[in-house]
């Protein structure tokens, strides 16, 4: 029985971390719309934590799958959602145990930065623009989840602002490249097409992160991010007409977080 479970765990898809992130974020977002007294956020965080717990089992029992994922041009860009989910969980944990929440937040940020570094190194070894897919936004810009979940510790605020500007700079560089890749290079493979939904996330995430850590936000920057966020979200809603007709795959997890963070940014 243990041997059977051992091999079943090996088959867990890495995009499960993206789904965990989406569920945890959705639970938090629902707190803005419904009088849930914190239970929506807590429920989403617990579900997300259980889901990434299964991935921890997989990575622990099968180290080779983690390294294979990190080297893959698509799956490797999804791995950081594991750390992003932990950041969202840290916000919930902070309500009950503030010190534990800060420690978890710091650990998740360091984990994300490590995944980002590995992703960049692997991609520089094979710098082909046709391999680029929208999930490539996740490693450099997903770090801004650290700003959205910032634990309100004054000494960490400068670091959180640096993380925001890192994400903003990466978006400014990657967005034109991504648009060029999608319009002028070979079509994204069917297996990676669900990641197109991620296009809706970066501007919304940057907007939510900026409004969280900046007490005196620039109206121009807010208007710019808001405009891009709305445009990208509307485009992806129309794209769902085709994306939802694709054969189901774990990549469908890419549909969750972009919608949740878009709603969160609007509430901000």
Each model region followed by its residue ranges:
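N-terminal signal-anchor module of multipass membrane proteins
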Residues: 1-56
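Helix-coil boundary and interhelical linker segments in multi-pass alpha-helical membrane proteins
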Residues: 28-39, 91-102, 148-161, 209-221, ...
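Alpha-helical transmembrane segments in multipass membrane proteins, preferentially the mid-helix core
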Residues: 115-119, 148-149, 173-182, 205-212, ...
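Structural signature of hydrophobic alpha-helical transmembrane segments
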Residues: 39-53, 98-113, 158-173, 219-230
